[in-house]
UniProtKB/Swiss-Prot annotation:
Toxin which activates the particulate form of guanylate cyclase and increases cyclic GMP levels within the host intestinal epithelial cells. Could play an important role in pathogenesis. Transmembrane segments: none annotated. InterPro entries: Heat-stable_enterotox_CS, Heat-stable_enterotox_STa. It comes from Yersinia enterocolitica. GO terms for molecular function: toxin activity. The lineage of its organism: Bacteria, Pseudomonadati, Pseudomonadota, Gammaproteobacteria, Enterobacterales. It is found in: Secreted. Residues 20-52 form a propeptide. This is Heat-stable enterotoxin B. Disulfide bonds join 59-64, 60-68, 63-71. Keywords: Disulfide bond, Enterotoxin, Secreted, Signal, Toxin, Virulence. Residues 1-19 form the signal peptide.
Amino acid sequence: MKKIILALVLMLFSFCTLGQETASMHLDDTLSAPIAAEINRKACDTQTPSPSEENDDWCCEVCCNPACAGC
């Protein structure tokens, strides 16, 4: 009985490990683009200049905002 339980535990463990490796290998650009956009948005939110500064394109320069001409 102990051998059966051990075999089941090992099978479950290997299934979980292989499932995580397979998922991480199949990440494509469709998933990484929204993540990059979120990181850029957070960087823009944390680096807002003071209202006295006259640089209107600060977010484009800091974040490479896709709405701007680009970097």
